[in-house]
Amino acid sequence: MIWRWESATRWYEAELISDLFGDWLVVRRWGGLYSERYGTKTDVVPDLFSGVALLFEIDQERQRRNPPYTLRNKSL
């Protein structure tokens, strides 16, 4: 499950995945649309539902940014 947000100059992605050990991870990536600079952060979540809840929290945070990010892609 990958969600992607964009502003005029920046992008942000959050991906919910299961690793080889069965752990659920939320991988966040961000960077500039016109640069090669980026960052990443991985959080381990207890289960699928906690991961989905974290995606919705991230969506709320992206909406509160000034200027706000727009959800461009939501794949399940």
Predicted regions located by residue number:
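Short, charged/polar surface micro-motifs in flexible loops or helix N-caps
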Residues: A8-R10, L20-F21
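Short N-terminal leader segment in a subset of presequences, especially plant chloroplast
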Residues: T9-E13, F49
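Short amphipathic alpha-helices within nucleic acid-binding modules
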Residues: D47-L55
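Short aromatic-glycine-(Arg/Gly/Cys) micro-motifs in beta-strand/loop hairpins
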Residues: E15-T42, F56, R65-P68, R72-K74
